[in-house]
Amino acid sequence: MADIHNDPFALTGLTYDDVLLLPELTDVVPSEVDTSAQLTKKIRLRIPLLSAAMDTVTEARMAIAMARQGGIGILHRNLSIEEQASQVRQVKRSESGMVEDPVTIGPDATIEELDQLCGHYRVSGLPVVDDDQQLIGIITNRDLRFVPTDQWASLKVRDCMTPRERLVTGKVGTSREEAKALLATNRVEKLPIIDEDGRLTGLITVKDFVKTEQYPNATKDERGRLMVGAAVGYWGDTWERACALRDAGVDVLVVDTANGGAALALEMIRKIKADPTFDGVQIIGGNVATTEGAQALIDAGVDAVKVGVGPGSICTTRVVAGVGVPQVTAIHLASLACKPAGVPLIADGGLQYSGDIGKAIVAGADTVMLGSLLAGCEESPGEVVFTNGKQYKRYRGMGSLGAMSSRGRKSYSKDRYFQADVSSDDKIVPEGIEGQVPYTGALAAVVYQLVGGLHQTMFYLGASTIDAVKRNGRFVRITSAGLRESHPHDVQMTTEAPNYHSSAK
């Protein structure tokens, strides 16, 4: 390769629409391939997909849905520290082998307070404990079935709960199989675990067994809880935020900036990695688009490198700042540092179709991060809007004016674009736009099509694993005529396929 420092025109930048993959001889069956991939040095996903840390893409509901499908969600940081940590706890509590620190309620709380607590944590009932954490009962929606709602403000939990003497309980050390047998034999949905003194130490629910069977590929930690990541910055309260997220049980922290090679971002990564209290948390750094940028993150100690400067559909960095690298080339350049170091690479942004996932992997990625492809899902936090009788969901870049503006609250995305010191909203220089994407329904259906497309890629390449995709894949560059030929052409499309939308062309 020519020295791009001496010859500014030596390097050609290619993106997904500039290349196709060559078909290979194959005996691979699409339904039998293994799509598992390394997210970080220590975390392996069953599918190589992450949902982006954007305020119209990933909050707790999306993170739960992504983990159940075998990927992982990265919670955005345009939230207060308390809100972001609370969302981490929501994900970790949503499913587990045993809830070791269950949410509880006191006997003198009102039913109205119980309802608010259950709604916040998305649970159907709570154990009732006294001031000494002694289990004195349990209250679920069964107990409230015939209680008029107009009495909820005055009725106490003790008036409606199932008392301790009527409960089925388990002892500390009860195995999963024993718990399942107790639940089935007694036809109950919740099994409180108590110690010798009658204190509540955990809670096992029948829903966790059902969810395990329903989502066999779910991404879980060693305690059977769904895994979740969260974004942090490098400025202001970042250290306090990182500590709060660690204490809430986060599995992955993403030091997320528009230029991962910035000194302040690298310094924050080194600070987190040097603290032994973060040994159980994997650290991802980004974003970069060059070999040097990736190497700087690796030298700082990251467990994965995130690649992408300006490829997103809502990003304007490349035209506002004139900086960026087309994504396929960016992935390749970063992989020149990541591969020898054994550090996984995440391709972030620019994907329009399922076929782009395979292209990213052949270029050097291990996993891909998705924004616009997931923003239209039911589980995304974006607002639903109607335009000309069709449903859409709002989608915006974290560098958009709306995401960066304070509007009466503190904005946490300004520092991602190194504008944390901007004194007022009218001085912000946006690097993104606000828009909308078609409503696409449940995440599970969208992921099925995306992963199904990857299965087909692996079939065509004769690759039964993600590593084999990297080994077998070969690119061919195409012209604008070749791109036109690749899409449906010379016909009026009457019915859109679930995995192809003409609006993305």
List where the protein language model places each region.
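Alpha/beta catalytic cores of nucleotide-metabolism and tRNA/nucleoside-modifying enzymes
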Residues: 1-25, 105-106, 171, 231, ...
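Catalytic beta/alpha-barrel core
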Residues: 75-78, 104, 125-127, 147, ...
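Short beta-strand/loop segments at the ligand-binding rim of alpha/beta enzyme cores
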Residues: 44-51, 97-102, 221-231, 273-289, ...
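Short hydrophobic beta-strand motif reused across regulatory alpha/beta modules
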Residues: 136-142, 201-205
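Catalytic cores of alpha/beta
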Residues: 61-64, 240-248, 289-307, 347, ...
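Active-site-adjacent beta->alpha loops and helix N-cap segments on the catalytic face
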Residues: 31, 80-89, 149-154, 199-219, ...
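Bateman/CBS regulatory modules and CBS-like beta-alpha motifs in cytosolic regions of diverse proteins
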Residues: 31-45, 52-54, 83-123, 128-130, ...
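Glycine-rich phosphate-binding active-site loops on the catalytic face of alpha/beta enzymes
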Residues: 68-83, 250-262, 303-321, 351-385
